Amino acid sequence: MASVSWRAVAVAMVVVLLSLQWFAKGYPEEDLVVRLPGQPTVGFKQYAGYVDVDVKAGRSLFYYYVEAVKQPDSKPLTLWLNGGPGCSSIGGGAFTELGPFYPTGDGRGLRVNSMSWNKASHLLFVESPAGVGWSYSNKSSDYNTGDKSTANDMLVFLLRWFEKFPKLKSRDLFLTGESYAGHYIPQLADAILSYNSHSSGFKFNIKGVAIGNPLLKLDRDSPATYEFFWSHGMISDELKLTITSQCDFDDYTFASPHNVSTACNEAISETENIITEYVNNYDVLLDVCYPSIVQQELRLKKMATKMSMGVDVCMTYERRFYFNLPEVQKALHANRTHLPYSWSMCSGVLNYSDIDGNIDMLPILKRIILNKTPIWIFSGDQDSVVPFGGSRTLVRELAQDLNFKTTVPYGAWFHKSQVGGWAIEYGKLLTFATVRGAAHMVPYAQPSRALHLFSSFVSGRRLPNNTHSSTDE
């Protein structure tokens, strides 16, 4: 009996010690993803689950977090948000672009993404706002939302997420995303900096903002699309001249109807009829199937044109099929409320404010930079939805407003002895870079160049202006 009692006590002590050791690591055991169905063996940990952002309303956001492949005790933390608005960062960023896995062709397994950004950083993906993916609210009125409430919920999310992961509170934090995240990320960064200025306790260790092909200012981004079409030989001189002379983009808004002339709307409609029937707007060189994330950009384009467009969904099925497998949802601790609809790349219940798409992000970006937070804007050069020309112009205007001098002149940057794109730096805090051969979803179209750009960003390195080999692989 004594021997049995001793063994029982010993076992109990081991359990307690293991529990203490686990929680000392600062990670929530209940959110650990032991293994995803069909997942290859990897050496890093994954976590997924919910964070309540409004307990009274029953509003919760779903997240997926992956540790860095190497040196997890010293790597920074990077948040990634996809756009839409209303599209999933898990179906998009995590499992189509920059996360550690891609679904296989049959939609039942996973394969390793050798260019995953968790080579350089811990990665956090959030389905935001509520109504996207597995994020939800018990109040249907919460699905009528916009930029301000989305930023507020994300601030609350991060504060409570760090309570789950206290070990990461002091890590360098980078905020990244693409497309309509050109609205999400700046407003979240602004909210974080405001929180830091008023907090006498915990402060976010925010170190930088990077956004790909971002919607920043509609009256610059919209005309850039038609300039891109014309410069690539996709529309005629006559149509380009009509748009230039008849469309006052300073008065162009997302809300329908556009506050523009009939001649302008007719010219835009003619352009869309020509382009969308034959060309993938998100990669004008691509004529094959495209990933599920294209749905998020379709939303952005529809908001601007109010036109019906066809989408090649051949790769959408893989993601949708995989994430609707019961065993996958169980492994991810997802869909805990048994939502009355299946998981989809973009929300069918969200009613996001069209008007918020008109908000000028440049004043917010200026405030972020005045807080000494670096900003990188990067653009795939084959994207016509938010073309690099508009983004480059906006970055230059922002630099002029800040009275920044050019600290690195415009020129090529290199990766693996090839031109990776072109870049310019202003005031040592503001960088614009193109990614050669990339499209709207830069990490998907050019994964190696995207990883090199990202690694440079989080490491505080400038993009190399010579053919020396990259240091991130």
Curated annotation (Swiss-Prot):
Family annotation (InterPro entries):
AB_hydrolase_fold, Peptidase_S10, Ser_caboxypep_ser_AS
Main location per the UniProt record: secreted
Q: Which GO terms describe its biological process?
A: proteolysis
Work out whether the entry's keyword set contains Nucleotide-binding.
no
- Gene3D superfamilies, alphabetically? 3.40.50.11320, 6.10.250.940, alpha/beta hydrolase
Q: What is its EC number?
A: 3.4.16.-
Report which superkingdom the organism of origin falls in. Answer: Eukaryota
Quote a single Gene Ontology cellular component term.
extracellular region
- For the keyword Secreted, the answer is yes
Tissues expressed in: Expression not detected.
Checking PROSITE patterns in the record gives: CARBOXYPEPT_SER_SER
Active site per the UniProt annotation: 179, 383, 440
Q: Which cysteines are joined by disulfide bonds?
A: 87-346, 247-264, 289-314
Tell me which residues are glycosylated: 138, 259, 335, 351, 465
Q: Where in the cell is it found?
A: Secreted
Would you indicate the residue range of the signal peptide?
1-26
UniProt-recorded Gene Ontology molecular function terms: serine-type carboxypeptidase activity
What keywords are assigned to this protein? Carboxypeptidase, Disulfide bond, Glycoprotein, Hydrolase, Protease, Secreted, Signal
Q: Which family does it belong to?
A: Belongs to the peptidase S10 family.
Give the function comment from the record: Probable carboxypeptidase.
| Protein name per its UniProtKB record | Serine carboxypeptidase-like 42
Origin species, per record, is Arabidopsis thaliana
